[in-house]
């Protein structure tokens, strides 16, 4: 009763809404790279490339209102973009953890290249997907690094990982960080804010 609507909506974010959010994040990042940040009034949002909101076939109308092009009270375009990026991240995380058994800490330690496709040697078709990362509870001998483990995941979870790879890519490059997911401050103008690193801890 509780999980069903969460998973349904998470799949909708991955398959229907994710492309719009990625386009918005990339537009923001491109604008950030060519703009001068002014501490008092922030960025000039009028020159941010416009991105569209797609119609959702399941809803029969656009899945959300148009993106802000200028601040509305205390609600800024940057804050709005960050919130939608976090919604996408939460949806992908729900799918990946529910369908694979990966723990939250293990998810935060995944790297960008964690996803691998296992192909049929004769046809070349993908027969299964797996994620490679570090376990959170496996005992490690003192002085030795933990050995990576594999989680076999279904295609839906693989699509979630691929969306996370795309959604955070521009920020990985900017912060020189290869983790699959960064924290919310990564979308800001600095790599650190209030002492929080870009990588989830």
Name each region found by the language model.
Residues 1-201:
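Extended, charge-enriched helical/coil interaction regions that scaffold DNA-processing
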């Amino acid at each position: 009763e509780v999980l069903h609507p969460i998973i349904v909506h998470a799949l909708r974010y991955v398959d229907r809404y994710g492309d719009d959010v990625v386009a918005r994040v990339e537009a923001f990042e491109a604008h950030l790279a060519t703009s001068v940040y002014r501490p008092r009034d922030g960025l000039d949002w009028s020159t941010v490339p416009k991105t569209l909101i797609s119609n959702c076939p399941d809803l029969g109308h656009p899945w959300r209102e148009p993106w802000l092009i200028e601040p509305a009270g205390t609600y800024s375009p940057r804050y709005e973009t960050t919130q939608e990026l976090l919604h996408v991240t939460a949806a992908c995380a729900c799918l990946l953890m529910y369908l694979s058994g990966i723990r939250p800490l293990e998810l935060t330690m995944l790297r960008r290249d964690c996803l691998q496709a296992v192909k049929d040697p004769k046809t070349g078709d993908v027969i299964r997907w797996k994620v490679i990362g570090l376990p959170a509870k496996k005992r490690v001998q003192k002085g030795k690094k933990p050995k990576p483990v594999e989680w076999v995941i279904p295609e839906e979870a693989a699509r979630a990982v691929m969306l996370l790879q795309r959604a955070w890519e521009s920020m990985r490059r900017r912060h020189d960080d290869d983790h699959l997911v960064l924290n919310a401050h990564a979308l800001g103008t600095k790599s650190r804010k209030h002492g929080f690193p870009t990588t989830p801890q």
